[in-house]
Amino acid sequence: MGASVKPAARRNARQFALQAIYSWQITKENVATIEEQFLSGDKYDEEELRASEPALAAPETDVAYFRELLSGVVLSHAELDSKIRPYVSRPMQDLDMMELALLRLAMYEMTRREDVPYKVVINEAIELAKVFAAEDSHKFVNGVLDKAAPHVRKK
């Protein structure tokens, strides 16, 4: 990560990317359309967003990173799924859609963004799970990524 990119801007990019990936999984809408909705503000009322999720409405977002994560996950979702599959104890189609989006996002970062330490990837996924997924999803996400990390990324 370059010195000019702040961690908060990356965190915001991940949050937007997670929600956009989740939206794509549900709708299968064109990535450019989903990206535009998130970046133009059409997806959310900004004041409402500030009240419910202040971090998402923060003025700092690494937009280039958001775009990379969204397009990268969508374009390589089948490959990412094949890397995730060995570490989940149930069929992929039985995963909660938010858990799947989280795992895809984290696996993309682990396999394609070696400039981001794997511990940061796992921690960010856990924090996102605590906010956006079911109550104990962060434990599941942590377990899967912890098992996968040594096999997909050199520590």
UniProtKB/Swiss-Prot annotation:
What superkingdom heads the lineage?
Bacteria
Recorded GO cellular component terms are: cytosol
Q: Which family does the entry's similarity section mention?
A: Belongs to the NusB family.
Any GO BP annotation: DNA-templated transcription termination
What does the record give as the function of this protein?
Involved in transcription antitermination. Required for transcription of ribosomal RNA (rRNA) genes. Binds specifically to the boxA antiterminator sequence of the ribosomal RNA (rrn) operons.
The GO terms this record gives for MF are: RNA binding
Q: Could you tell me the gene encoding this protein?
A: nusB
In its UniProt entry, what is this protein called? Transcription antitermination protein NusB
Give the UniProt keywords, A-Z: RNA-binding, Transcription, Transcription antitermination, Transcription regulation
